[in-house]
């Protein structure tokens, strides 16, 4: 019963679309911004960092709660595979929010949150390093902003690096990370599929 409760609550936590709520309060329709994604990146572009940054942090932290409580409080004795499925359910909730007719965000910030809890920030450091290198190279080419297609490519490169890290952890006593990784990859790939298709056509 506890396992089902944890997975369900984590899904509902991920499904709360803070960026959409903040945008509505500001009178902004995120569906008309850039790629129409109802996430923090588009809110940032539409309303600036004062609104985008808090939304980004909320998207991040909903990937950590409530699983962090169960991970750090060993008295609950929750199976680590259940924790992995719960972390994945939070990402799924953001990507396919029932509060937005199952049309959610790209789930990158929520992914960072989930991996922070299960890997003590190691997973997000892998993704963050790849994203930073990509941004530096992009600026060296004289570009200040990335397109949705370039963002999608960056995410896929980041997940390729995360796969290497995941396999290393799997073979060193954390096989449950394979569940989180492959489920997470499928969700993120699906959410970026159209941008990736356009990117590959333009290469």
Curated annotation (Swiss-Prot):
Pathway: Lipid metabolism; phospholipid metabolism. It catalyses: an acyl phosphate + sn-glycerol 3-phosphate = a 1-acyl-sn-glycero-3-phosphate + phosphate. It is found in: Cell inner membrane. It holds the Pfam family G3P_acyltransf. GO terms for molecular function: acyl-phosphate glycerol-3-phosphate acyltransferase activity. GO terms for cellular component: plasma membrane. Keywords: Cell inner membrane, Cell membrane, Lipid biosynthesis, Lipid metabolism, Membrane, Phospholipid biosynthesis, Phospholipid metabolism, Transferase, Transmembrane, Transmembrane helix. Its main location: membrane. One of its GO terms (biological process) is phospholipid biosynthetic process. It is a multi-pass membrane protein. The chain crosses the membrane at residues 2-22, 52-72, 82-102, 117-137, 150-168, 170-190. Its EC number is 2.3.1.275. It is an enzyme of class 2 (transferase). It comes from the Bacteria. Belongs to the PlsY family. Probably interacts with PlsX. Catalyzes the transfer of an acyl group from acyl-phosphate (acyl-PO(4)) to glycerol-3-phosphate (G3P) to form lysophosphatidic acid (LPA). This enzyme utilizes acyl-phosphate as fatty acyl donor, but not acyl-CoA or acyl-ACP. This is Glycerol-3-phosphate acyltransferase 1. The lineage of its organism: Bacteria, Thermotogati, Thermotogota, Thermotogae, Thermotogales.
